[in-house]
C-alpha cells in the first residue's frame, strides 16, 4: 500500500508544495505516474490564476480545502489536473504538467503537458473537487525519491504574470525504473 499525502502536506505554502510534489506518484485508477513538472497558481493577486477574478462557481474548489482536485477544461477540449494548496479560504493550486507514466508491461513513457496527462489517464471534470487525501484510487503518494535538483522557469501558456518563475521541472529526466515496488530515479 502506498502512503497517500495528507492534508497537512497540501496546507503548506504553494511553492513548497510544488517543489515537494516533484518525484511523488500520481495514482489514478490503474495508472501510476511520477510527477516531473509542476506549476503554481497562487492567490487572488496572481493574474494568471483562475482565482484572480474572485470566488465563482468554477473557482470555489480553489478556495476550499487543501488536497482536493481542481480539474477544468481549457480551449474547450483539454482537461487540466491541479491540486488545491494553502489553508482553506486562500485560493491556490498546483498544476500537474508532466509525469513519467509507469507500466509493468511497457516502457515508461514521459507525458508532457497537462492536457495529455488527463487524456491518457481519462481524468475529466467529473474528477473535480475530489479529496485526494482520502481516495485510494485518485491520490498522490509519497515515494522514496528525494528531488533536490530542479529548476524554476516562467509558467507556460499564459499571457499575464509571466514574470513569476513558478514552473518547477526536474531537469534531464532520463529514466525511472520500477523495482520491487520501490522507485529509483536516474537523473543526468
Swiss-Prot record:
Any one Gene Ontology BP term: base-excision repair
Entry EC number(s): 3.2.2.-
Cell membrane as UniProt keyword: no
Family matches, as SUPFAM superfamilies: FMT C-terminal domain-like (SSF50486)
Keywords on record: DNA damage, DNA repair, Hydrolase
Keyword Cell inner membrane: no
GO molecular function: alkylbase DNA N-glycosylase activity; DNA binding
Family to which this protein belongs: Belongs to the DNA glycosylase MPG family.
The protein, known as: Putative 3-methyladenine DNA glycosylase
Native species: Ehrlichia ruminantium (strain Gardel)
Lineage of source species: Bacteria, Pseudomonadati, Pseudomonadota, Alphaproteobacteria, Rickettsiales
